Amino acid sequence: MRALSILGSTGSIGLSTLDVVRQHPDRFKIVGLAEGHDVNMLAEQIREFNPSIVSVRDAGSAELLKTLLGTDLPEICHGIEGAGTVAAAEGSDMVVSAIVGAAGLTPTVKAIKAGKDIALANKETLVVAGQLVSDLVKKHNVRLLPVDSEHSAIFQSLQGHRQEDVERIILTASGGPFRNSSFADMEKAGPEQALKHPQWSMGAKITIDSASMMNKGLEVIEAHWLFNMPAEKIGVVVHPQSIIHSMVEYIDGCVIAQLGSPDMRAPIAYALSWPERCESGIKKLDLATIGTLTFEEPDMVRFPALRLAFDALKAGRTYPAVLNAANEVAVAAFLNNKIGFTAIAETVDKTMQAHEAYTPVELEEYINADGWARRAANAIIG
């Protein structure tokens, strides 16, 4: 029986994780839940899964939750501190890190320091503070298991092989809703068009990141830290069908890939059950029905966010944290109709150019870089 705490339980990844848990009551139990936006849904989850500790966004949400639940309450915390308390709570042996954005960093660090294995869906944790997190994982002897479909695919394709035999890893990208759009059309696109992902059902922020290809850029940085790969050995290919989730090319010219239906429950189930496997509930793959798998080079002129992410990875220091924070601010501004779609990457670019990078050591230094970038990006947006 694996005891789990889920950070971001009411989001897309959290809901998919609970669906996997629901299928295997003999294998998984829920110890803690943390959410930020939907207290009513959290109340339903508490009734079903009976966690011993939960966290909500703020004190007002905590009072609302108490009212909704009545008697027989779990321990209730709130804020980022509360999420960290859930992450480090006794009784769990794995934490699913699925809070959106850099807000997931501090609770994930607390979970690692508490000796919890991490099922990582929050890619920003490694984008913002990859060196710090990697060092902590080694120091506390915990496992960091990828939940992103691409990184799960790489992880699976590396099993049983030597690191020195790897030529490169290849992340696949759907291309998003604007794969065939001109730059001029993207300049005019609003949130409604950008939120129409052709393959995946995800939250708003990651869907916009997929449309700009910033999501793939963040995944490149995440892959660097997860698999100890330099930028030169990380490739990206556009694969519109989203059936091949990523690949590993070896020095003998052979390529090993992981295929499956585009459903996040599969990589979640693999992370939760590793080194075993368990039923995920996804639709079985029928290649004859799919018929054709196609591939294209990514266009970094129309999608400069991907180039900016590679630039940030190569430059290192605080640039990845600044890239991520500026992007979070710009995506929020786009979703609120304050800027156009192509202004997202422009805002990130200008913020990175204005940044005087340094080499962070402590968590606070990473957080300071994040805060600086948010202020700078907001000033650029106006």
UniProtKB/Swiss-Prot annotation:
Residues that hold NADPH according to the record: 10-13, 36, 122, 124, 203
Residues at which Mn(2+) binds: 148, 150, 219
Domain of life: Bacteria
BP terms from Gene Ontology: isopentenyl diphosphate biosynthetic process, methylerythritol 4-phosphate pathway involved in terpenoid biosynthetic process
Transcription regulation found in the keyword field: no
E.C. no: 1.1.1.267
Keywords for the protein's UniProt record, in alphabetical order: Isoprene biosynthesis, Manganese, Metal-binding, NADP, Oxidoreductase
Pathway assignment: Isoprenoid biosynthesis; isopentenyl diphosphate biosynthesis via DXP pathway; isopentenyl diphosphate from 1-deoxy-D-xylulose 5-phosphate: step 1/6
UniProt catalytic activity: 2-C-methyl-D-erythritol 4-phosphate + NADP(+) = 1-deoxy-D-xylulose 5-phosphate + NADPH + H(+)
List of residues binding 1-deoxy-D-xylulose 5-phosphate: 123, 149-150, 174, 197, 210, 215-216, 219
One Pfam match: DXP_reductoisom
UniProt GO molecular function: 1-deoxy-D-xylulose-5-phosphate reductoisomerase activity; manganese ion binding; NADPH binding
Group of enzyme by EC: oxidoreductase
Cofactors: Mg(2+); Mn(2+)
Function: Catalyzes the NADPH-dependent rearrangement and reduction of 1-deoxy-D-xylulose-5-phosphate (DXP) to 2-C-methyl-D-erythritol 4-phosphate (MEP).
Family listed: Belongs to the DXR family.
Protein's name according to its UniProt entry: 1-deoxy-D-xylulose 5-phosphate reductoisomerase
Organism from which the protein derives: Chlorobium luteolum (strain DSM 273 / BCRC 81028 / 2530)
